[in-house]
Amino acid sequence: MRRNQLPIPVFLLLLLLLPRDATAATGKPRYVVLVPSELYAGVPEKVCVHLNHLNETVTLNVTLEYGVQYSNLLIDQAVDKDSSYCSSFTISRPLSPSALIAVEIKGPTHHFIKKKSMWITKAESPVFVQTDKPIYKPGQTVKFRVVSVDISFRPVNETFPVVYIENPKRNRIFQWQNVDLPGGLHQLSFPLSVEPALGIYKVVVQKDSGKKIEHSFEVKEYVLPKFEVQVKMPKTMAFLEEELVVTACGLYTYGKPVPGLVTMKVCRKYTQSYSNCHGQHSKSICEEFSKQADEKGCFRQVVKTKVFQPRQKGYDMKIEVEAKIKEDGTGIELTGTGSCEIANTLSKLKFTKANTFYRPGLPFFGQVLLVDEKGQPIPNKNLTVQVNSVRSQFTFTTDEHGLANILIDTTNFTFSFMGIRVIYKQNNICFDNWWVDEYHTQADHSAARIFSPSRSYIQLELVLGTLACGQTQEIRIHFLLNEDALKDAKDLTFYYLIKARGSIFNSGSHVLPLEQGKVKGVVSFPIRVEPGMAPVAKLIVYTILPNEELIADVQKFDIEKCFANTVNLSFPSAQSLPASDTHLTVKATPLSLCALTAVDQSVLLLKPEAKLSPQSIYNLLPQKAEQGAYLGPLPYKGGENCIKAEDITHNGIVYTPKQDLNDNDAYSVFQSIGLKIFTNTRVHKPRYCPMYQAYPPLPYVGEPQALAMSAIPGAGYRSSNIRTSSMMMMGASEVAQEVEVRETVRKYFPETWIWDMVPLDLSGDGELPVKVPDTITEWKASAFCLSGTTGLGLSSTISHKVFQPFFLELTLPYSVVRGEAFILKATVLNYMPHCIRIHVSLEMSPDFLAVPVGSHEDSHCICGNERKTVSWAVTPKSLGEVNFTATAEALQSPELCGNKVAEVPALVQKDTVVKPVIVEPEGIEKEQTYNTLLCPQDAELQENWTLDLPANVVEGSARATQSVLGDILGSAMQNLQNLLQMPYGCGEQNMVLFVPNIYVLEYLNETQQLTEAIKSKAISYLISGYQRQLNYQHSDGSYSTFGDRGMRHSQGNTWLTAFVLKAFAQAQSYIYIEKTHITNAFNWLSMKQRENGCFQQSGSLLNNAMKGGVDDEVTLSAYITIALLEMPLPVTHSVVRNALFCLETAWASISNSQESHVYTKALLAYAFALAGNRAKRSEVLESLNKDAVNEEESVHWQRPKNVEENVREMRSFSYKPRAPSAEVEMTAYVLLAYLTSASSRPTRDLSSSDLTTASKIVKWISKQQNSHGGFSSTQDTVVALQALSKYGAATFTKSNKEVSVTIESSGTVSGTLHVNNGNRLLLQEVRLADLPGNYITKVSGSGCVYLQTSLKYNILPEAEGEAPFTLKVNTLPLNFDKAEHHRKFQIHINVSYIGERPNSNMVIVDVKMVSGFIPVKPSVKKLQDQSNIQRTEVNTNHVLIYIEKLTNQTMGFSFAVEQDIPVKNLKPAPVKVYDYYETDEFAIEEYSAPFSSDSEQGNA
């Protein structure tokens, strides 16, 4: 038989028949103990106790239990009849994330004990990272701060296991371990390489718990904008509006308007959801407008919206605007954008505040806000309020702020759940595929009824808005009391408790005298709003009625996000002059430590960022669970008796009682804000005894998501509620006329001006004196301070404008060729309200000839907000860097400017700007280097030498120096980042910037010459090189010359991967290298090993010398084996053991061969030496000695004769002979083989014969060095420097003796230099004046010195000899309009290889710009779309194009250049193509601008 529920009238009758003693007052003692439902470990927490009607002394014990272990939180003895207090406790180290909290109250006749489950969470300290700016250029230094505070914002002396930098490819490129934060703050810095991976980087801070705090910054190649383009328009417009006002304004960073042409494009884009043509330009609706900016730098346009069809679907529901402003004078064009949403929702309603619960008989409070589509309040409109659909309906009117306060009388409400809907306008539901209809949103809210057996209630009146820190807020309580429940009580005490940041913050009470018959009314009391209550405070108010019933209500307050440490930051004035002195004053809590920052507004225009703000700091706070969660498996032991739900049979029908579960009770109120309540008062609604379950039903706590969580029975797992985020910080008296003229000379232009720490004194004051930068801009400055007492405080961002009433700007080319002329423009800008008379002058110099352009006037009138440009036609006469100094001076003159009197500025009367121009000689630069190693032993040595110049040398271009060093690696040490005058744009070339630093550090360390300065510089180069090399890494751990290039097919290169693997393994001793990079590279290489132990080639060999005259596999395997042994891996390692088997097998074949195989044998000799195989090492060296070239007491090795002769012929077209790269490399490998033995310190166990041979090899190698200490190319430089460093360590001796070097020419002493232990690493240089000339160098004393003579000169290109490349260069105007054709043209290049080999190695095409022109970067970048072009670079006035290889098939490509500065008498510019590894193989061709033969002879 189906069971039926008992009818409601019968159920109510049963409730009335409940025993009277269930509701009667007993007068027994009452206990209330309150604890947060989640506790933090390591920070103070509170437990609050309320004891009432005690008739005996009791002991209170609050205990935290972990199984059989426990800790006491509170032990107290209560004597007073009534007491209410809170007590603090701290949980040091929790044994488990969950525990039981037990409350026991025991007296002679009373015993109360209850246990509840509890979460315990370690309080994670909020941590944030602040960088000095949001965006960086390659090569700049990233500065950042790590800050740690507790949940009260007091500094935490925390230690982080690791802080690291992660690049856009998620590679860890640098790290700091065990970073301490004394005082809660630590500053770190990190240098970016000159060629880093561009994109988003991260600073990652890892805590002990493993949690990571990440902060992002961008690395980008950029130029700071001079001005910004602002597009001002409504964010939203109604679809019925007919006009849209759009304003575009240009403002300089110093706040002044930009004069220029404004172009505005207004579009609504096409966006059918089923179309692939979203945003398709041809289907977009667009209009364009153009006009000169007004005096405010703005252009205002009223746009008619009808053309954009705002009511039609199928288009984006927004109008987008792109505005461009082209600055007058310079032609610089910048863009700004804006958009306006087209809204069909014409009104929106939302609840700003409302009661969470409702209590029958007490008014329900709520507030709603009505706004239009733009978010503007709609005043004086009637709103309809419906309760539970249309059962009850009310009308309220909005005030002038669009707010309507809702007050609903609930006296007659009987429903357990109240749903409230607020309506402004009803919607007409109409679905149309083509047209948009208007819509009005409604506001909805729900409130559950609170159960009270006596129908007694209290309700807090809503507090609207955000409460300010420091204010006193009145709390109003509405009450409705049952007289029977009050009995004869004369007063009633209201207890309140404030919960903030998950913990109990404060508590108190207020007594209400009871008047006879007054059971309904309002009582109020004040509370003070304090910073510790922010951002949200939860107030719970409760009282205990004489019938033992507890009634309560709760309300949340939004608190101003304030800090106890108030920080004020100020400059003495809002504006300063460039280069003046000022100071930044900071005020905060005494003895605070303050971190100050000031960033150029231009940086923030380029990369806006979120400021470090109260909101961002408060977002870092961990969040506790707000709802009490049942953890299980604690059996349910409610303090209240349950009602047995027995069936009732009536007229033969069985009725089941209906239990109402929808009402909330006082227990739910406490639970809703995360409080555990232990009490013997009545806080629960009646419950039926459980029939089938061992555990209680989880209470509904008023939040749908909490109810959903509680539906999981026995849930013992809970994800972390602690949220950690990271933040970036923005980063920001008159002089009388007779006094000396004040002049500014501007040359200091930083992007971050201030990045300093300032400790405050006992009065809370601090001052930072600073020099104002020369940038005419606005600086954004801010500060945060840390105090051990009041914690963290933030200042507001302040602005400081650097400005002067008038200033001068110079427009110059980067470089010109001697004989060319250019127009130097000096523009004076006047931003004063009055006119000034200005004299503009250019300081004359013998280095150039300057002639004024146009009518020459001694002075010029410039009125307010106007500018004047004065020009000179300049012809440089000297070579090198020529400085141009221009001055604008305000004159005291009776002469009127029109009808206005010219005034003299009080602060600055003169502005001077100095800018350089590089003046280059005509033709192509050549360099010859002569190196000599002289070792006098207490006797004078003399060397005669001659500097000759070729017949076709360019007059005045020759310059020469002789350098003297006391150390074999001295020159290389001076030029570690400039060993080669070649580009470094690929994965192998970058290693020449990386690896030599390791050898220098090892050499200096072994010879005890390592200083902190050298170590710091070398390590910084290693860090930079490590960053760059990761650009060439593939996802599988391998490396290739140009890296993983996205869609273009590329694979790892076996040879380069081995090179990188060895270098990274060796660099670990000096810098952080991520282990996975070494592991992954080694694993990848291991996969390339064949069964015979040899390695197979993957990727192309850009250097043909690696082929070595034998099977490529043997040479490559020898190279990889050397790399593995140098890591070092032991010879017993399986990969190494198998590789050595490959080499031994190969040597057996080579030793019986009649061919030379010099390159391969050199590698084999060194590999066997590293492996400790002395026998094989001796065999190979003996074979190599037969191939050795002995000359002039030196020894070296060279390639087979036929190749050598071909190369020598090629040299006849080039420089004075220097050994090819491959010969230096193979000779260096032989030197390494001689210097390496099996001992732990191999260089100390060498025989005298080995050292003698090594010395002869060193003499030859040292003669091949270039003027920077490198050699011809990358591999020869790396291997030769490694060999020289080993030789230097083997032969190093300290001596107190000195060597003197005297240089004479024609009987005249050019210079005398002295070398000793104190300066042996110092590069000493003498400039040689006689060119051509005969010189004598005399060396005396005891020791060795390295002499290097460098001769540089320019020659005019001649068709001499047969070049191994064909090169043709043509130019063509891009615009045939005669007035414009000289401003832009195309350079087309055809190139091929016609040398002796089937194809070239990697080739560089170097295109120098003609003066006054710059490359169009997108057209250069587009060249990389061609399969054979691997990379392009734009270097000042050069374009570099990397080509993988060339054959005899002609390859053609082109790119565009455009005019930057007008230059007359344009000279041709050279294009050079050369083999990167055989630098003697090259060709040169000149090109001219297509209009250079015009009558004007230039582009001026």
Curated annotation (Swiss-Prot):
Entry GO terms, CC: extracellular space
Gene3D superfamilies (UniProt xref): 1.50.10.20, 2.20.130.20, 2.60.120.1540, 2.60.40.1930, 2.60.40.1940, 6.20.50.160, Alpha-macroglobulin, receptor-binding domain, Immunoglobulins
Molecular function, one GO term: brain-derived neurotrophic factor binding
Superkingdom per UniProt: Eukaryota
Primary localization class, coarse: secreted
Positions of the UniProt region annotated as Receptor-binding domain: 1360-1500
Keyword Signal: yes
Chain intervals for the UniProt region annotation (Bait region): 686-746
Entry keyword set: Bait region, Disulfide bond, Glycoprotein, Protease inhibitor, Secreted, Serine protease inhibitor, Signal, Thioester bond
Tissue expression per record: Widely expressed. Highest level in ovary, testis, uterus and prostate. Protein found in plasma.
CDD domains in UniProt: A2M_2 (cd02897)
SUPFAM superfamilies assigned: Alpha-macroglobulin receptor domain, E set domains, Terpenoid cyclases/Protein prenyltransferases
Cross-link Isoglutamyl cysteine thioester (Cys-Gln) residue location(s): 986-989
Cross-referenced InterPro entries: A-macroglobulin_rcpt-bd, A-macroglobulin_rcpt-bd_sf, A2M/Complement_sys, A2M_N_BRD, A2M_TED, Alpha-macroglob_thiol-ester_cl, Alpha-macroglobulin_TED, Ig-like_fold
Disulfide topology: 48-86, 249-298, 267-286, 469-562, 594-785, 642-689, 835-863, 861-897, 935-1344, 1094-1142
Subcellular localization: Secreted
Residues annotated as signal peptide: 1-24
Glycosylation sites: 55, 61, 157, 382, 412, 568, 883, 944, 1005, 1390, 1448
Keyword Membrane recorded: no
PANTHER family per UniProt: MACROGLOBULIN / COMPLEMENT, PREGNANCY ZONE PROTEIN
Sequence similarity: Belongs to the protease inhibitor I39 (alpha-2-macroglobulin) family.
Role summary: Is able to inhibit all four classes of proteinases by a unique 'trapping' mechanism. This protein has a peptide stretch, called the 'bait region' which contains specific cleavage sites for different proteinases. When a proteinase cleaves the bait region, a conformational change is induced in the protein which traps the proteinase. The entrapped enzyme remains active against low molecular weight substrates (activity against high molecular weight substrates is greatly reduced).
Subunit-level organization: Homotetramer; disulfide-linked.
UniProt name for this protein: Alpha-1-macroglobulin
Organism: Rattus norvegicus (Rat)
Organismal lineage: Eukaryota, Metazoa, Chordata, Craniata, Vertebrata
Protein's gene: A1m
